[in-house]
Curated annotation (Swiss-Prot):
Linked residues for Glycyl lysine isopeptide (Lys-Gly) (interchain with G-Cter in SUMO2): K160, K314, K322
Gene name linked to the record: BRIX1
Stated name of the protein: Ribosome biogenesis protein BRX1 homolog
Gene Ontology MF, one: RNA binding
Keywords assigned: Acetylation, Isopeptide bond, Nucleus, Phosphoprotein, Ribosome biogenesis, Ubl conjugation
Subcellular location per the Swiss-Prot or TrEMBL entry: Nucleus, Nucleolus
SMART domains assigned to the protein according to its UniProt record, in alphabetical order: Brix
GO biological process: ribosomal large subunit assembly; rRNA processing
Disulfide bridge partners, by residue number: none
Residue ranges occupied by any Brix domain in the UniProt entry: 60-249
GO cellular component: chromosome; nucleolus
General function of this protein: Required for biogenesis of the 60S ribosomal subunit.
Length: 353
């Protein structure tokens, strides 16, 4: 029995050696050839996955969230930004009582190094913080003229998760505070290459334009045929307030001299309307005083009647006869109509007999 086992083992070893020799010589057995052909056919039918020739190195993660008290338009804008930025993360609303320094701890827990924070005040004013957590810098903006994707309904469209191009106004390179904001916007809004949630396509462009001391944001689709631009949305305008050295605080690097707070703006509007009302009341009071004043009687000017010619005096006629009464044409027509009607009735009754 032992001898037979040894022989079998030896036979198996010999067969394995033969297979190895055939593989080296390029001659596979018939079964191996069939397996390779089946694998080749399966590979032909298989749909190739997305092409990724590189490694994800830029690990930028953006935390996008807000404070309590925002309205529906701000919430929709926040959702649109999350949709356009696949490298973003969401979090629950922050309480108003918490200080802004707590956001740095939230970013650390969420493993994010950039933050977009929407701060609502008085249920009508919206502020946006762009911050590099935890070391800074950070910038505070007043958000104006918000138009969301659902509100605009533009004809443009882009692939969800695709990477955008960033287009900046040449004015960003002229002043140092705009150059700092440009770098901050590049790091926040640019989707990292080879990000797992991103698509390997570039089919839309974010434009940042400086006009009237404000930054105007637009999102356009790039059409493949003629490279034309069609707007997608959303839209908003950023009015810079301050740039801080730290994240959500610290020494002030720049303060916008052209900025006017919403409270001040509303106060100016109220003062203008109040001034108009006061002016109307003053005009009414002056008119009342003029009416109450006694009228000054001017002395008669004899030269005023120089060119007045007196009318000829007509003789007085006394009418002794009573004037004839005026003929009432309407009553006369009615009488004639009644007479004609009676005649017709008589004629019709005579014919019937």
């Amino acid at each position: 029995m032992a001898a037979t086992k040894r022989k079998r083992r030896g036979g198996l070893a010999v067969q394995a050696k033969k297979l190895k020799r055939d593989a080296k010589d390029g001659k596979l057995p018939a079964k191996a050839n069939d397996v390779s052909e089946e694998a080749a056919e399966e590979e032909k039918d298989r749909i190739p996955g997305p092409v990724c020739k590189g490694k994800w190195k830029n690990k930028e993660r953006i935390l996008i969230f807000s404070s309590r008290g925002i309205n529906f338009r701000t919430r929709h804008l926040m959702q649109d930004l999350r949709m356009l930025m696949p490298h973003s993360k969401a979090d629950t609303k922050m309480d108003r009582k918490d200080k802004l320094f707590v956001i740095n701890e939230v970013c650390e827990m969420k493993n994010c190094n950039k933050c977009i924070y929407f701060e609502a005040k008085k249920k009508q004013d919206l502020y946006m913080w762009l911050s590099n957590s935890p070391h800074g810098p950070s910038a505070k903006f007043l958000v104006q003229n918000i138009h969301t994707l659902a509100e605009l309904k533009m004809t443009g469209n882009c692939l969800k998760g695709s990477r955008p191009l960033l287009s900046f106004d040449p004015a960003f390179d002229e002043l140092p505070h705009y150059a700092l904001l440009k770098e901050l916007l590049i790091q926040i809004f640019s989707t990292p290459r080879y990000h797992p949630k991103s698509q390997p396509f570039v089919d839309h462009v974010f434009t940042f334009t400086i006009l009237d001391n404000r930054i105007w944001f637009r999102n356009f689709q790039i059409i493949e045929e003629d490279a034309a631009l069609v707007e997608i949305g959303p839209r908003f305008v950023l009015n810079l307030i301050k740039i801080f050295q730290g994240s959500f605080g610290g020494p002030t690097l720049y303060e916008n001299p052209h900025y006017q707070s919403p409270n001040m703006h509303r106060r100016v509007i109220r003062s203008i309307t109040a001034a108009k009302y006061r002016e109307k009341q003053q005009v009414k009071d002056v008119q009342k005083l003029r009416k109450k004043e006694p009228k000054t009687i001017l002395p008669h000017d004899p030269t005023a009647d120089v060119f007045v010619t007196p009318a000829e005096e007509k003789p007085v006629e006394i009418q002794w006869v009573k004037p004839e009464p005026k003929v009432d044409l309407k009553a006369r027509k009615k009488r004639i109509y009644k007479r004609q009607r009676k005649m017709k009735q008589k004629m019709s009754s005579g014919n019937a007999k």
